[in-house]
Amino acid sequence: MTNNAAAPLYSLRGLPLIGWRDMSHALNYLFADGQLKQGTLVAINAEKLLTAEDNPEVRALIAAAEFKYADGISVVRSIRKKFPQAQVSRVAGADLWEALMARAGKEGTPVFLVGGKPEVLAQTEAKLRTQWNVNIVGSQDGYFTPEQRQALFSRIHASGAKIVTVAMGSPKQELLMRDCREVHPHALYMGVGGTYDVFTGHVKRAPKIWQNLGLEWLYRLLSQPKRITRQMRLLRYLRWHYTGDL
C-alpha cells in the first residue's frame, strides 16, 4: 500500500493496530486531504497489551479508540512476525506528539493541553509557542478534582480545539478522553503520558542510539531499577510472541 492517506490494519491479541511506515506516513494519514482526522490516538506497547488482556475496562477503552498504533518495538516485531509482508515501523508517541504539534503550528490548528504539573504545563505551552508558533487555545494541569471534570470539558468545547492532548498516564487519560468526547466530539485526542516532562527537559529520554536499536526500554530500566517488577511482566508477552499466540 503506497497511498500516504491510507494505512493497513494488523491485529494483535484481537486489537487492530494501524501500520504506519514512518512518521511522514503517520502525519499524512492523520491530515489526509488537508483534513485532520477526528477520534482518539492510543499508543500501543507490550505493557499496554498485557494490561488490556487483564483489565476488561482498559481493553474496552483501547478497543474504542479509532487510531491504535505501534509505539513499542516489541509490538512492531510481533506485527512483522505475524504478518511477514507488513511494512510497519515504530512511531514513538513522544515523537508523534512533537510532529503533530509542529504540523499544528504550521497550519494554525487550535490545540488544548491537559495534564502535567502546573510549572511543566506552563513551560510546555511557552516552548510550543516559541518553537512552532502553536495556537494553544487553552490548558489545564493535571491537578483537578472529579467534580471539576465537566467544567473542563465545557472549556475544551468552548475553545474550539481541534487537537486535545492529555498527559495523565494510562488509563486515566483514556478515561478522560472518552468522557470529554461526549461533550466535544469533533477533535483529535491523544494520550501522551509523560511527554510534557520529556519535552521540557524534566525527564531525560534515552539517547538516539538506544532508541534506534529498539532498546529504549532497557535504558529506562537501567535508569530506574525499580521498573524491574513491571519489566518482569513482559515475560508473558515474550511467550505470546515466540509461540505465535498473537
UniProtKB/Swiss-Prot annotation:
Q: Which CDD domains match?
A: Glyco_transf_WecG_TagA
Question: Is-annotated flag, keyword Oxidoreductase?
Answer: no
Q: Is Ion transport found in the keyword set?
A: no
What cystine pairs are annotated?
none
Q: Which UniProt keywords apply?
A: Glycosyltransferase, Transferase
Supply the EC number(s): 2.4.1.180
Purpose of the protein: Catalyzes the synthesis of Und-PP-GlcNAc-ManNAcA (Lipid II), the second lipid-linked intermediate involved in enterobacterial common antigen (ECA) synthesis.
What is the protein named?
Answer: UDP-N-acetyl-D-mannosaminuronic acid transferase
